[in-house]
From Swiss-Prot:
InterPro entries: TCTA (IPR016560)
Primary site of residence: membrane
Family matches, as PANTHER family: T-CELL LEUKEMIA TRANSLOCATION-ALTERED GENE PROTEIN (PTHR32267:SF2)
Extracellular side: 2-8, 65-106
Protein name: T-cell leukemia translocation-altered gene protein homolog
UniProt key word Transmembrane: yes
Annotated localization: Membrane
Gene expressing this chain: TCTA
Pfam assignment, any one: T_cell_tran_alt
Key words of the record: Acetylation, Membrane, Transmembrane, Transmembrane helix
Species in which this protein is naturally found: Bos taurus (Bovine)
Family: Belongs to the TCTA family.
Positions where N-acetylalanine occurs in the chain: 2
Length: 106
């Protein structure tokens, strides 16, 4: 029969995870101070990400209302500029309803 989990192993789990994260962080700091090429690449990619996010935020500030206006058009239609209620009336279809359906042979 399998042994149940002991309370000590569950209590040691957060300490183990924090220890591993601490070791990873200290290794990263050593490489950061040594100006390793990977760290330089990381800095460059982090700068690119921050610059891209700031550019998106700035563009949304200028053009956000225009983009929102494309999706929410005023008019007779429902939400998001759907087909107006009055346009579903097709008189040519009503006159054709009295005629029998045509088959592909006719």
């Amino acid at each position: 029969m399998a042994e149940p989990w002991s309370g000590q192993s569950l209590q040691a789990l957060p300490a183990t995870v924090l220890g591993a994260l601490g070791a990873l962080g200290s290794e990263f700091l050593r490489e950061w101070e040594a100006q390793d090429m990977r760290v330089t690449l990381f800095k460059l990619l982090l700068f690119w990400l921050v610059l891209s996010l700031l550019s998106i935020q700035l563009a949304w500030g200028f053009y956000g209302s225009t983009v929102t206006g494309l999706y929410h058009r005023p008019g007779l239609g429902g939400q998001n500029g759907s087909t107006p209620d009055g346009s579903t009336h097709f008189p040519s279809w009503e006159t054709a309803a009295n005629e029998p359906l045509k088959t592909h042979r006719e």
